[in-house]
Amino acid sequence: MEKNVKSSVTGISSQVSTHQLETKTQFTKYHTRGGHGFAAEDANAMYDRLQGKKVDMCGRDNALNGADRIVDGVKIQTKYCQSAQCSFSKAFDTTGQYRYSGMKLEVPSDQYAEVVTKMKEAINQGRVPGVTDPNQATQIVTKGKYTYAQAKQIAKPGNIESLKFDLTTQAAACAFACGISAGITFFIELQKGATYGDALKEAAKVGGKTGGLALLGSVASQQFLRTTIGRNCAAAATKAVKPAVQAAMKTEVGKNVITKTASVMAGKQVFGSAATNVVTKALRTNAVVSSVMFVATTVPDVVNVCRGKMTAGEAVENAACNASGIGGGCSGASAGAAVGTMLCPGIGTVVGGIVGGIAGGIGGSTAMKKLISLFK
């Protein structure tokens, strides 16, 4: 039962991880020429959230001269360039006027002092509309939490800065997996007649293992998607799932489910092709994340086979059950979330996803075990 719980919760965790990737990062742009700028936006936004601030990543609409994000009602434009002069000049239009009136200009922490000096000069020159006091430069320019070099590293795979960023953004998936698996295990142990103390010990053990596995898989997924191979896999997944989403949009029920699900994910009302794109991207990312999660659950068994602690047959059986559990968990979570969204967007989405994921994951893993037993 422990393995069933772990595989099903891992499947649900991949959904949580996908949600974090799609809503909290712009990972698909990290590999571009200005990818470090998007990484800087994401990293600084993450820091704001950790401080308990409300963050709206409004800049994804690419509005001309619009804010990249709004933090507790304050509009912020992020400029992370190679030099302070470049970061500063990017905030001014071709006529030499400050482009982002009423917004704070966020720059790399190591360029802050120099940009403030340049902003004071611009104010004295009358190039900042509505501002005449050069001392207000410190109120316009805000110090980013990361240096230019750190932002460059966050956009790339396989380094300390990007790993730290991924660990932080995916902590939610880990905590979710740990809590859900511990709760299920505790209930199962009590049903089996265990004492509260023993049930808590087993719940803590299973929860810790599952949470750690979820974190490993989530971080590995985020790192993998930064690589060329990862991006190619994501592109292939997009081609595979998009026709299905488009076909579903042609039915009334499918259109309703996709529109509501996309709106919950986007945090605002989206319709038509916009809703199709949101759901397609989520399914694409989830396909990659689930695959990485499967590898993460399989590697320990491969190691045990090499050490002689497990037979190859047992490893294959576990792999098949893990695949079924993760797949069932993902499918169940998706279906449950869709139904929950139709009934009550938001709360219904979460509850439906959890219930559907657990049922689908345990059901898939159990069914695979029974199928394998027929050939023994």
Where are these regions (language model features)?
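Glycine-rich, hydrophobic membrane-spanning regions of integral membrane proteins that mediate transport
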Residues: M1-G34, A43-D61, R69-K75, C81-S291, ...
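Short, surface-exposed, charge-dense and proline/glycine-enriched linear segments
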Residues: A84-Y98, G346, G360, G364-I372
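Helix-termini ("caps") and immediately adjacent flexible loops/tails
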Residues: F294-M310, A315-G325, G357-K376
